[in-house]
Amino acid sequence: MDELIGLFIEDEVANVDVYTRLFALEGLKLNYLDNLPLTVDSYYDIILERNVDFLIIDFHLEKQVTYKGIDVLREIRKHDSTIYAVLLTNYELDDFADQFGDYDYELQKSEINSRYKDVAEKIKRACGLREENMMYRAVEIKQQQDTETIRLLQEINSKLDQKKG
């Protein structure tokens, strides 16, 4: 697996610097946005443009914008249910597990310094599984296309046989 690249969605530059260095120790590269978008609508396009493998999203973004990190995650989930995301919070969210899936992880900020190695391993595993699932999906799509091609060729062959006869 190539170097994994994440997008850190954070409104405090000091946190960006600390977490970027922390995750670099575990072989993960974190990119960030100098200025957060005014709305959540453009985040998925940013993810595609930057070709990121995972996300780390701060829950509180009020120093730059009016929306919250969980709103960003909801918007991204409308387009992609498999990119791994870590939501950093100051407190536990009651219904987080019910709202989001296997590729979402909630972590309290107070725990990140002691658990960053664990989080990095979770990110690596999830990104590996995502890549594997995408390969299986690509094979499945190719098989469906091949099956359809064979069906069409058989149909054409049958019509040609009818014209001969």
Functional labels for PLM-detected ranges:
Residues 71, 86-121:
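Alpha4 helix (beta4-alpha4-beta5 surface) of REC/receiver domains from two-component response regulators
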Residues 128-165:
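C-terminal output/effector regions of signal-responsive regulators
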Residues 9-10, 33, 55:
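Conserved sequence signature across two-component system core domains
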Residues 48-50, 75-82:
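Conserved phosphotransfer cores of two-component systems
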Residues 27-39:
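Short hydrophobic/Thr-rich beta-strand motif most characteristic of the beta2 strand and flanking loop
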Residues 53-76:
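Conserved phosphotransfer microenvironments
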